[in-house]
Amino acid sequence: MIPVVALVGRPNVGKSTLFNRLTRTRDALVADFPGLTRDRKYGRAEVEGHEFIIIDTGGIDGTEDGVETRMAGQSLVAIEEADIVLFMVDARAGLMPADEGIAKHLRSREKMTVLVANKTDGLDPDMVTADFYSLGMGEVYAIAASHGRGVTSLLETVLLPFVQDEIEEPVELTEEEENAAYWAALEAEEQASEEEAEDDFNPEDLPIKLAIVGRPNVGKSTLTNRILGEERVVVYDMPGTTRDSIYIPMVRDEREYILIDTAGVRKRGKVTETVEKFSVIKTLQAIEDANVVLLVIDAREGISDQDLSLLGFILNSGRSLVIVMNKWDGLSQEVRDQVKDTLDLRLGFIDFARIHFISALHGSGVGNLFESVTEAYSCATRRVSTAMLTRIMQMASDDHQPPLVRGRRVKLKYAHAGGYNPPIVVIHGNQVKDLPDSYKRYLMNYYRRSLEVMGTPIRIQFKEGENPFAEKRNKLTPTQLRKRKRLMSHLKKSK
């Protein structure tokens, strides 16, 4: 089992900074702002070849109210999941009543706890850590997470011995058993390499990255928790509850997924806090990183311009799409009909995306989402042969010939796959770059119908073959040169 390490402490003591330092990423949002982290965030770290899992948590200060209560609950869950707890305190702020309350709870859980005093840069470590010994947590390790000072010593002194203790003692084998094990391992390795060489890359072997995006307070985290069957992320009736993108692995029907719960995206003019700007960037990065995007829309508020703006970013990113109309419960039939009419009117240009009407709070319709998700992913990653793509191109050309350009008919020669997720079809021919947009849309829709592609956009790219005689002058052959010489000689004599 890989050891699990939880980072616990008051708000703004540097837990996310240490998380980024240990995982060597910038996955956790960091700013000088209490309460920035609200959900449990998981990451992998390594000490001398030994892996362990790091959990970043929201702060606990004992005065939680409203959404902060949920944040504290996430931290308590992380403590229960952990093998080691790094209890972080702020050396600059000194010992606080909330630190004593957290220490009391940790002692009651009987977890292996290490007291870490952060923000000791520029200070005398012995002097600033003296007060924290009164917590009764043993040795105090002084670090400066933002600069990395003391972090390596912390890892080697605390975490590495724990990881090594987890490694089982090797079992003594006889010489015959060692030889048999060696040849069995060698045979298995050769067989695996042969199979790997024979088998093509199979996207079905990879987990589907599923991003849940939308405006603030449309129910993204509620939907995430409903899918997972636990309160994995903080849910509260207040816009902006989620501030970071949370990656959560899960398995459903023997298929692996990675759920990405994101922060809400508002109009640019309303994004004022620096923290929120970082959150929006994280959301847009999550869309780029995802395979399939669930765009959650509040059915009671209808489709806004911001929904369309977010939709445009998803399409420009080439991501597969499933539209989710949340909060469908409680709407009258008349309102539901109006919402559907609005969808047909404003989203008619993306007829390839499945639309689901659900209630994340009560769970109605949520189970049907994954059928559309797997369909969209399969269509986006399906391999299609050059022969098939060329045949479809020829059928489309026979049904509706390309138009004339400057008096000449555009000629389509052949087509092949240019990429996947989204599917890209590259068409070669003469004057293809002069094709009007209407004919390009015709080809795109023809490929979509022929390949039965749903849930993902298709991109068509055109390439023209180079003219081999473009910059070449006509040169006479040796025979032609001899004839020319005789002709010139004859003309001179005749004069």
Swiss-Prot record:
Domain of life per record: Bacteria
Location of the KH-like domain: 382-466
Lineage of the species this protein comes from: Bacteria, Pseudomonadati, Pseudomonadota, Gammaproteobacteria, Enterobacterales
Gene expressing this chain: der
Alphabetical keyword list: GTP-binding, Nucleotide-binding, Repeat, Ribosome biogenesis
Entry GO MF terms: GTP binding; ribosome binding
Subunit structure: Associates with the 50S ribosomal subunit.
Cited function: GTPase that plays an essential role in the late steps of ribosome biogenesis.
Protein family membership: Belongs to the TRAFAC class TrmE-Era-EngA-EngB-Septin-like GTPase superfamily. EngA (Der) GTPase family.
Positions bound to GTP 2: 214-221, 261-265, 326-329
Any Gene Ontology biological process: ribosome biogenesis
Protein name according to UniProt: GTPase Der
Residue ranges of every copy of the EngA-type G domain listed in the record: 3-166, 208-381
Binding site for GTP 1: 9-16, 56-60, 118-121
Cross-referenced Pfam families: KH_dom-like (PF14714), MMR_HSR1 (PF01926)
